[in-house]
Amino acid sequence: ANTYQLQVDVDTAEFFMMALVLVALLLKLDKEKLFKWKGRIIYTLVSCMIFAGFTQVYVYSDYLENIGVDFRVYRPQYKYRYYGTLLTTMRTFGYLHVTQPKDYSVSAVKKITKQYTDSNSTESTETKKPNIIAIMNESFADLKEVGDLQVSQDYMPFFRKLKENTIKGYTYSSVFGGNTANSEFEFMTGNTLAFLPDNSVPYQLFLRSKTAGLTHTLKNQGYSPCYALHPFYKTGYSRYKVYPLMGFDKFYTSDNFSVFTDTVNYHITDSEDYKKLISLYENRTDKDKPFYLFNVTMQNHGSYDGSTLETGDDVQIEGDLQSYSKAEQYLNMIKMSDNALKELVHYFEKVDEPTVIVFFGDHQPDLEEDFYNKLLHTDIQKLEGEELEKLYKVPFLIWANYDIKEENVERTSNNYLSTYLAEVAGIKKTGYLEYLTKLREEIPAINAIGYWDKNGKFYEVDDKKSPYYELIHQYNLLEYNNLFGKDDQQKEFFYIKN
């Protein structure tokens, strides 16, 4: 986003200087014929062979990983610093190709989907379906869950106290400090980043046609209108292209807010965001139909400059980490988010229509690496497996303004949140949602790092010795068919029949 600060280091400056020299040489050479046509052919062939060999070794093989060069990290920008722009960029190309899962075939997929498409999902007995509001809150995280953080007062008191008619707990994201769109992708489609290339963004790389997911599921059951709201530019992560493919009727952006709208850290506040949300709800045209809105907030977006908020800093970091003003600024922004959530819940408490709100953070904040090192008492660049997952843990809740069974969820992941939502709202599930509901009983959480089984044991995604390897492989087959199956996509499994 446009609030990040650009810092040019020595390596970057050298790279641009070399690039300028190279361009100058090419312009010079263009004016002179150095080789005859036979020589040019030879040099072209040799160049192609060198390039092919380079890409085979450095892009598509495991050579770099075998010598200890690891690009699979939570913050890829650090790899550009450590390994250089050329090598990191070239290696990234290898991650953009999605390999067809082993033993993939349409018949193999049908064998899995048959039991779900043959059975009939039960639909709610409610005479009126509830309105559904899904909020993915920018960088909303609980840093106390990462390490021993001492603060002067709680920064999310309302979130913690909200228990009545509430399902809450922690969900695991597949991204850290950025790539927000990947969290919403997992939530809205039920797919996981575990089977997609590292550092890829499906919105920008893979979604080119109608995309199965929560919005189409709700539309096919009478939800209208189905809105998306994001108080920033529409072009971010190609949302203006992707949201129609997902089934949204209209996409509201910062263009739909007044220039006098309150901001913090250059972004529209959650309070103003929710006022727009309420306005869209109150002024919808189809008031006889259930309402659905998906909201991606912006308030807590980085970068953080450590400045004092205009509202005053109420939360102060104490102890060894008190010098980190950026983290302190962030925590005070989270408290603002908590207050805005309280206002939103209090509003819908008074609404007569049944309404469900699902709320979750997209990822943890992009704060100083040294802050996280001290918070965790280790070098976060060396974290692996379950220890690394501490950086992917964010809070979530599902609240209703009517009676539902309260539940505390120790851990889940973004791809499963829609299954909890479907159960609370009483909506009819697709075969895919039924499958995910059953899968979460055995594998309650999965993300790009790995997964936990029902007993709390952690596994890497590609661990072939895991007793759940076959279940994971089946999930991979289904996701591949969903995203890349084209004409072979099992539509009766991924969509509700009209």
Roles of regions detected by a PLM:
Residues 4, 102-105, 198:
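Ubiquitous "structural anchor" signal
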Residues 56-134:
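Membrane-interface segments at or immediately adjacent to transmembrane helices
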Residues 116-130, 134-137, 142-498:
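Solvent-exposed soluble domains appended to multi-pass membrane proteins
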